[in-house]
């Protein structure tokens, strides 16, 4: 027993400063050794399922992209089914504060109401717009871990320009951006106890009480919710809905990429340390794997994904193909050196391989398979990237790079 305690102390003390791994990351079957990554062959981006070469933008948009999205829908994230009864969507601005952050911005609290014969549910959507910028403004929409009805979204009194949750909204306002937040647990519980109590119930036909194997899991429900946020933004005269960047961190980074891949109304996507089922390649099996994900979070993906546990090479897709489905709209991937659970190398390679499609469509992408040096961001490219030192979080350095990327790709001439 004493030996075990001593081992754990040495293990914890020996971690680099800033490392904040959870217990799951110490599982003995988790691989962090680059020399143990298996040989793999990625599914081709520019060859159709019937073997036809994809050589034109038209062939990509009309043939290959729909094929890939269909595979991700039915095998990874799950399809949103046709509801038995149409879902009505309506918006209600329940509160408006034109003096938010000492007059720097206006805050709107919006209820997005969803209902049909099966029931009703609401999302609490937040919209912040800078007061000193000509409207309509471009904006960021963030998949939030923080409850949008909590005081996390109040202005901080101790850190000017920040929310109580630490987000530097003052910097966004100074740069002329709006900021929006959607809390996906309004729509779907993220564990097996709460999973069945949310949006899924509105879509069931009579007699169904659980999603089919190919139907939507948590991440797909999150993506659907963000698109309802976009529905509202299309009605808000203060927001330029043609210049919306969708973003998210960690689990919400996974949802972000799936949101942007499907919903072309989003002009730009930012994935922050999204890892497995986000930007990282499945086939590398480095850090978190499909097995780890579906064991701990069985409903994040659709149940068809379970078939590929320890058989990732049998998947007809990998995550570079998800990023490619966002093209030609810009996408940005953020990694960090100590976030080994998210496989930063796999995240970069995914973005690098997706660049092939961006170039086909007349855009620009990552030029080298070598990961850039720390704090050497790639910004002047339709596929952007940076890696910094440290662990699993969004730091001020990251926020600033996200804004820099948006300045290049969203700001009007």
What kind of feature is each model-predicted range?
Residues 351-413:
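C-terminal catalytic histidine-bearing segment of alpha/beta-hydrolase fold enzymes
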Residues 19-80, 405:
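N-terminal pre-domain segments of enzymes
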Residues 79-138, 146-148:
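N-terminal cap/lid segment of alpha/beta-hydrolase-fold proteins
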Residues 327-344, 388-390:
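Conserved strand-to-loop "acid loop" that flanks and positions the catalytic carboxylate
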